[in-house]
Amino acid sequence: MIEFQHVSKFYKGGKVAVDDINLSFDKGEFICFIGTSGSGKTTSMRMLNRMTDPSKGKILIDGQDIQKINPVELRRQIGYVIQNIGLMPHMTIRENIVLVPKLLKVPVEERNKIAEKMIDLVELPREMLDRYPNELSGGQQQRIGVVRALAANQDIILMDEPFGALDPITRDS
């Protein structure tokens, strides 16, 4: 379970990004934050994976205050698809997909199976696994960003405008 308890985020100059939110999500729930630009959606997700910390309040995962969890360890437990894709340009598509499983010490053979399963999931040819991000279209890169977040089978997956770079035909299929 994820809980936001009276969580607020203030930036310099008094700008309020998130103001006293109280939310609770049970395991297995699919939640969407919908709002205008600047309404705190991204900030809320960034607080959940400790890319930024709340100014006030607590965020709990399974009853544990995330401020007491090492941020690197916390992030290894959370899949995250960011707005601007975020693929590592010096790594192949295979290496990008299995980045977190590698950090989690998953054996190479199993990582290769994961990469193949994930690229099949987004209906891209397996030959693309040995290419680099700059050799793929923006929509293809976005799909790789999504499956990278799924590759380690984490309990929490955060998606911040995950389909922003997809063309409407791909997005609707």
Question: Where on the chain are the PLM-derived regions?
Answer:
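The feature captures the beta-strand-to-loop junction immediately N-terminal to the Walker
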Residues: I34-T36
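Helix-to-loop junction immediately C-terminal to a conserved catalytic motif
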Residues: N49
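Conserved signature/switch motifs of ABC ATPase nucleotide-binding domains
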Residues: N134, A152, L158-M159
